[in-house]
């Protein structure tokens, strides 16, 4: 039986869910089929933009560009308003599904010419043992090897043969060192698994035992080896931390340190000449097996913060094929625009922000779109969790229903990965369902109310984004006498704050219209 508080909460949530009723998009009860994103999110008139579209069912439709004056369809708002562009001709486009493949991993492609011996070693710390995953794999045209957890147990797959590499179960958040000596010529493997630290960082490093096992394996031949960490040959992913990987192929040694090249997705080798690349942005600069608890940031002791934390649901870049590449007209006015796709399976709008062309005249006023905040909340599922709590999921709009059914869209900073760790990265290189007209009651939609308000007052204004200020600094703000914030300018980088303070010292006037800002 529902408590009175649950009933009241349910009534409030139902009102929130029913706020956004518009005939321009899918309605509650409809199944959302079409989605997409664009790159970049903010650009100047005359620059190039790409739109990436996908539909779960093949659909024919028309794509056009609209200038969005107001994206708020609520009864209390000024009214939804958009204007198709005459300067960009609509296109008939057939959409098919472009899959999402989340999950971070690392990869190096290593030279090999039918080696006799291969040895592999690395530290690993499982963080989600209830889910099976491949910790490391080696693949060639003529064979493969996978190291994986099957529940609590560490196992190996060598060609068609599987073995348990350690009889004792693994423990979550405990560091282990695995060393495999693979004698391909003799078809034998020696596996050593050492446990060198407790689950508590406050304790000293201890030798807690080593397990050694030998196996006879099927014949495996390697030419070039695709060496992956946290990924299998079939694309499966793993949750946990890995540090200090090394692989020796006959006499060629390859070693990498994840404490190096922290600003890059590619790690140069300590030994050998093959780089190792990260995909879907695992968390870097996290504590490794030798962290002693004395240092609280990676810059103080990089050799102790030398691990990468992989998650099966990390998503930095959807990696879709561009559906359309477009050069915007030079004379396009600054404003909020959308790619609008109207097809047999529904309608989807993907917003983007246009600044004046580099040679164009600027307005005196700019509306600063808080895109950093949009990204922090991107694809958040807070309303979904609230709806589940009170049994009101049927009241969700299609965008939220879609998010509930598609965790492969990635997470926001307001969620946790299934292993309990926080979400470090939130990206715009994926469909962001709340970055849609009318999709949410805060962030983007009410910011379009401000745009409509200024337009209604016939106040000439340009659009600038957080990303522009972070990238260009003072130069992005300098043309303007007045900056108007969005309704929720919550997240600011140091570069943004420095630029804003310098702009104000030079005489700029800031109109803060936010209810939660400048953290």
Describe each model-derived feature in a short phrase.
Residues 38-43:
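Short beta-strand segments of immunoglobulin-like
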